[in-house]
Curated annotation (Swiss-Prot):
The gene is tig. Its main location: cytoplasm. One of its GO terms (cellular component) is cytoplasm. One of its GO terms (molecular function) is ribosome binding. The lineage of its organism: Bacteria, Bacillati, Cyanobacteriota, Cyanophyceae, Synechococcales. Belongs to the FKBP-type PPIase family. Tig subfamily. This is Trigger factor. Involved in protein export. Acts as a chaperone by maintaining the newly synthesized protein in an open conformation. Functions as a peptidyl-prolyl cis-trans isomerase. It is found in: Cytoplasm.
Amino acid sequence: MSAAKLNVKTSAKPNSRIAVEVEVPANRCKNSYDEALSKLSRSISIPGFRKGKVPKTVVIQQLGVKRIQASALESLLQKVWTETLDQEGIEPLCEPELEDGFETILENFNPEKTLILKLETDITPIPTLKKSSGLTAEVENLIFDPKKVDELIEQSRAQLATKVPVSDRAAQKGDIALVSFKGSFSDDGSEIEGGSADSIEIELEQGRMIPGFIEGVIGMNINDEKTLKCEFPKDYHQEEAKGRKAEFNVSLEDLKIKELPELNDEFAKQASDKENMSDLRADLEKRLKEDNDRKQAKTRQDSLLDVLVKELEVDLPKSLIDQEVRTIVEQTAQNFAQQGIDVKSMFTPELVKSLMESSKGEAEKKLRQKFALQALAKSEKIEVSDKEINSKLEQVEADIKLSNEKNIDAERLKEAITDDLLQEKLFAWLEENNTVVEKTPEKARDQIKEKSSKKKTTKTNKEKKSSKTPKS
């Protein structure tokens, strides 16, 4: 026999929160108390009594009424809350909060009387859009810079460079120095954690080490020893080192320079699968242009999403923001771990607290973007069909087989594909029903003016030359 319907009152609160008042009949309170007493009498061990055969009066005497009432109330709260959610169709985002607190309710709890419970919880917000079409988004036009081809080639040259020993001069900027060092803090002489190394290669370029270190090594000769005075940046990742002055005892053991390969067809074969420099340049230019186009498309999407979010009306609950903040911090930790950084020592409680505080803005922005797209999909009835999902799934599964990937979660893969396809449709709708104004960046405008000015100057000079009267 199912329990009688509960008398429930609900009222909306700010930030997608709901207040729930439940009237629990006295008979249910009494039943819960009796059940708790019976359960405890079966589980408690008391000298002189067999387990499970302890009289209830002895249990009450041993444990006290409040202990039994606490057990009864805890069980009652759980059951009543589950029934309330089911009865009222409430989908909570977090555990409920008791308005008066458990201890206060327990203090006033009488199993013979009706219990009034007042709880609050967060619920999923219902987003709406004031407007979704006829909007205007401004986006900076990303102009492809041919110089990037040369930059990539120079990076490849640096990677394929030969290290040549140097012994007849002091260390210079750009050299590769083999050094050993030991660091300590200037204020108390304590050793710096991770501040010592034996025979490691360091490229003498600014930004490779903390300020003062590279500058100090430059000018040293092989076998020289020197004490460098440095200072850790105020935003340094290790909390105990932030802004502190330090001293490093450094010895220069060896010195090398990078000898770059010549830019010829042999280099093209080494750096790529191309046979000559002409093909290599053409391939790099093609890839860079494609990358530029992808970035431009992403910039357009971001701009359209920004103007759509401005039309969004949504009340974000605290629990959702907190959850998104945790996700951002966890992703940050994973990124550092992938770079080989010791996350456990780096992520101190102070740093985690600081990161969580500073990530709130980003978390709210991401949630607003998510709800704006959800509201658009609902209002415009934009959906992805099973046929579209299965077609894309077949393509992806074929690629997975070719790459010999294993341990793929089929359900998560399908969810990701569905989300991607829906997002494609949503942005296609936004592009079609709104205006994107592309603006030329100021730097690019200056370059265009400069080129135009040079062309005019060249043309004027030619005209001057042609207008001169020839000598007779």
